[in-house]
Curated annotation (Swiss-Prot):
Residues 1-20 form the signal peptide. A lipid is attached at C21 (S-diacylglycerol cysteine). Pfam families: LPP (PF04728). PROSITE patterns: PROKAR_LIPOPROTEIN. GO terms for molecular function: lipid binding; peptidoglycan binding. HAMAP family: Lpp (MF_00843). Keywords: Cell outer membrane, Cell wall, Coiled coil, Lipoprotein, Membrane, Palmitate, Peptidoglycan-anchor, Repeat, Secreted, Signal. Belongs to the Lpp family. A lipid is attached at C21 (N-palmitoyl cysteine). Its main location: membrane. It is found in: Cell outer membrane; Secreted, Cell wall. This is Major outer membrane lipoprotein Lpp. The modification N6-murein peptidoglycan lysine is found at K78.
Length: 78
């Protein structure tokens, strides 16, 4: 039990020391990286939404073409 408390105390102390050693420049750089990644995610999301509408338009065109072909086949069978 005492060993567990000692290890836990060492982990907490180490975390505190590491947190105190981080510099504002590094935090600013990481914040900038996060903002850049968020912008890229937003752009990719917009691209996916644009592609979805293009895919739906292609599906609609294919359905209309298939319907026309079905109608032509019916007229030949008559």
């Amino acid at each position: 039990m005492n060993r567990t408390k000692l290890v836990l105390g060492a982990v907490i102390l180490g975390s505190t020391l590491l947190a105190g050693c981080s510099s504002n420049a590094k935090i600013d750089q990481l914040s900038s990286d996060v903002q850049t990644l968020n912008a890229k995610v937003d752009q990719l999301s917009n691209d996916v939404n644009a592609i979805r509408s293009d895919v739906q338009a292609a599906k609609d065109d294919a359905a209309r073409a298939n319907q026309r072909l079905d109608n032509q086949v019916r007229t030949y069978k008559k």
